[in-house]
Amino acid sequence: MNRASPAVKTESNPLSTDELRKIDAYWRAANYLSVGQIYLLDNPLLKEPLTVTHIKPRLLGHWGTCPGLSFIYAHLNRIIKKFDLDMFYVCGPGHGGPAMVANTWLEGSYSEFYPRISRDATGMKRLFRQFSFPGGIPSHVAPETAGSINEGGELGYSLSHAFGAAFDNPDLIVACVVGDGEAETGPLAASWHSNKFLNPARDGAVLPILHLNGYKIANPTILARISHEELESLFAGYGYQPYFVEGSDPGPMHQSMAAVLDTAIESIRRIQREARSRGVNSGERQEAVTYPRWPLIILRSPKGWTGPEEVDGKKLEDYWRSHQVPLAELGSKPDHLKQLEDWMRSYKPEELFDENGCLMPELAALAPEGDRRMGANPHANGGLLLKELEMPDFRSYAVDVPVPGTEVREATRETGKFLRDIMKLNLDSSNFRVMGPDETSSNRLDALFDVTARAWVAQQLPEDEHLSPDGRVMEILSEHICQGWLEGYLLTGRHGLFSCYEAFIHIVDSMFNQHAKWLKVSKEIPWRRPIASLNYLLTSHVWRQDHNGFSHQDPGFIDLVVNKKASIIRVYLPPDANTLLYITDKCLRSRNFINVIVAGKQPALQWLDMDAAIRHGSAGIGIWGWASNDQEDEPDVVMACAGDIPTLETLAAVDLLRRHVPELRIRVVNIVDLMTLQPRSEHPDGLSDWDFDTLFTTNKPIIFAYHGYPWLIHRLTYRRTNHPNLHVRGYKEEGTTTTPFDMTVLNDLDRFHLVMDVADRVPKLSSKGAYLKQLMRDKLIDHKRYIRQYGEDMPEIRDWHWPSPGS
């Protein structure tokens, strides 16, 4: 284990002898606490020889990254105090949880959130015991960790979170530690390009710190095994100014880190000062690249630094074996127990903590105070800073629907006008952004460009449109980065919306999972304040991807979403423009949810006027009386639909049934809020059994046309009384490049198949049903012949509309 003698302050050594002694002691204290959390149940100050009874029965956690994380934390504390910075720490190597907990305990913020974990020997014992222990805290930098917005259990998102946090926070610096293992992930690799979207005149700064300790779980890391020149060129090519801090001797490393951080902060301030005095690009188009070279620090230090050099004759420090728990089997290997005690005593806890277990006052004075402490920074508990969006009245954007099924509109285009004016009303507040992977115009939201542009700080050409350093629409062709930016933006107290093609939102399936888990836990932590919901607007959906083909056809994101906690997720399938307006308003006003809205962008028939849309959207489910004819009697069949195209095909099927079997009593039920189908005991939006039975009856056939995979509806309704009579049509992985209507035919969701389903399941149709089915089969044959001859749908399909009253 390396120990440095104090260095003399020179021009290249910014720390005085006393400053170096103190900062090294502070680092040793954090390392001691990190080891204690992994191993100890008792004897926190080692006031007696270590025995097996002091050791946890199950040793969990990760040591390897902790000393580097704590080294960084101690030095960030120094520059926060020196420059009076508003800064917090995003920890990419989330398995370094012990380090982040240790440092927030040392600075005092942890004990303010958890008074039982006091800043003394009793609190230290509890701190150690709770780590990775039943009833305690997780091993990663979870929501329970003060100052965290990035758990880091699943790697790759730290840097996009950091940039999301920095947008529109001009006085904030986000120090983002990126693990060299994490740097190999796709999302992190793309995140380096975020510097082309950060406007130094308006936004805060991100200080990336690449933690190059050389190893993952059992392999070397790529960036640690390329040459210094290649590594420097890589990050210079990304547009950063890299600074290196390299070594293993703590004394010189402290001096080097202090000097580099001083330079980095001065560079950030110079970049911002120049941009804020003259603007970025001066608002003019430039053919030269003009974004600044932000500083980036590459910290090359040993994995498991200051830990045992060897265990059982095998290398440990500066090798992958230090990744997790360096010393195991302490009960059966006394030499391991002795090695652990020697390791912990090497930090000289008697120099760090007084008799009562309190951090020595001269060391405690190194930490910032109040909200300047990174564990107490309000940006890391964004609900503290959350302000309501200024919202126009969505009813002002209503589509006029004098009668159902005759007017044609593009639902997302109408919502784009609403989003445009939300953006306009909140320009001064700078707290609303729209994210998308190069799809804002494609998804018909381009009204936004009436009031803002795409954020862009890189090169501009004369022919470019809607690019500006001041833009508030964020577009990069990486769903991962869009989601990461938005999460960072929301977690620090702002609002936003993510618009994406339905099939390709699957790219962020696991990011959705992680954010849902974060929200679930955050809701259970009293000091975590509610944040704005994460809102997805999924369009260009499965039923209108006939032109792009099978690869673009997948509605399965909904299935993933409904697996998560009912307290977190909401799924909406508005059938038309007015309902979409209502749902969008509702979602943007909500807190601590993940809202998924699936809506069409193509021209489509409109069903509800605004008053009806509000009533229907508010209930989430309801009978469409104007499309039903069972008002005077029990229905013979319930025709249910969820989604814009299933609604269209259901109503077209109802029209056919009413023309060919007018005596049939039909009830049409439309579902906007998918979770109403679950029992109320399972989801707060769910219908009671009584209400569900009232809508769907207890014994009549239900023909359900659903936007996505049909088995999901069976999952949601399996406990309902009438589930045995439920027949669901939806997407069943049939698709290609074809016509819009043929997509529904390939999946048996079209009007003709729905009519045949009714004929098969309503006993009173008897022989008439056979003739009806034959007629529908003939129509399907006509359809196939027509599209293969003409390349488009039949006129009776293209031109169909809901019959006017009396027709």
From Swiss-Prot:
Cofactor(s) needed: thiamine diphosphate
Leading EC class: lyase
Keyword Nucleus assigned: no
Transmembrane stretches, start-end: none
UniProt superkingdom: Bacteria
Record-linked SUPFAM superfamilies: Thiamin diphosphate-binding fold (THDP-binding)
A Pfam family hit: XFP_C
Annotated EC: 4.1.2.-
One example GO MF annotation: aldehyde-lyase activity
Listed name of the protein: Probable phosphoketolase
